[in-house]
Amino acid sequence: MVTKIICQGAEAKIYLEEDKIIKQRIPKTYRNQILDEKIRYSRNKKEAKILYKAKKLNLDVPKIYNFNEKKQIPQDKDKLILEYINGEKLSDFLDSYSLKKQMNIMKKFGKQVGLLHENDIIHSDLTTSNTILKKNKVYIIDFGLSYISKKIEDKAVDIHLIKQALNAKHYKNYENLYLSFLEGYNSNEKKEILNRLEIVEKRGRYKH
């Protein structure tokens, strides 16, 4: 069985092992060992529970394999074993598609995010780097920063992130892509969230 590292961040190393992703949280040597273990386990548990919840809601996210459904905790304290989504990362491929296909993809992406928010799941890192197209489905990955919140502000900030990402990375068709995202984004709180988004953006401009 071949295992290779495909990514390393500040918090975790990501390995590919056949058709599975292993996310191994990195120990922090500057922290007290017992405290570090607690922090890593807490973050591991939170990410696992949110991924499990999203999958149960039939959202297009990776399956989690090492999760104890009965106890609602991961079976490992510092790693997650996830489904490998072998598709096209949108940050690399979106601009190469026809405009019609790009807009259709963004509409699907918006629908997925709307379902996350309907169930109070905040992703916190919504970019096309964390979105993969596979067999005409749009998968959202990397829930490492995700959390549960009912706050309109938090949902608005989530949308602000994808809006910024589109403007920075896919600026050529930015307006069409963002409008397509909003077309797909359905939530009972959509009006309130978009109103709050305007406030968030004004606040950001004021800071700069």
Could you say what each language-model-derived stretch is?
Residues 1-15, 59, 189-195, 200-201:
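Nucleotide/phosphate-binding site architecture used for ATP/NTP-dependent chemistry
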Residues 5-45:
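ATP-binding glycine-rich loop module of kinase domains
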Residues 16-19, 24, 66, 84, ...:
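Conserved hydrophobic "DFG−1" position in protein kinase catalytic cores
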Residues 41-44, 62-106:
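Conserved structural core of kinase catalytic domains
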Residues 51-59, 93-129, 134, 138, ...:
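Conserved kinase catalytic-core helix
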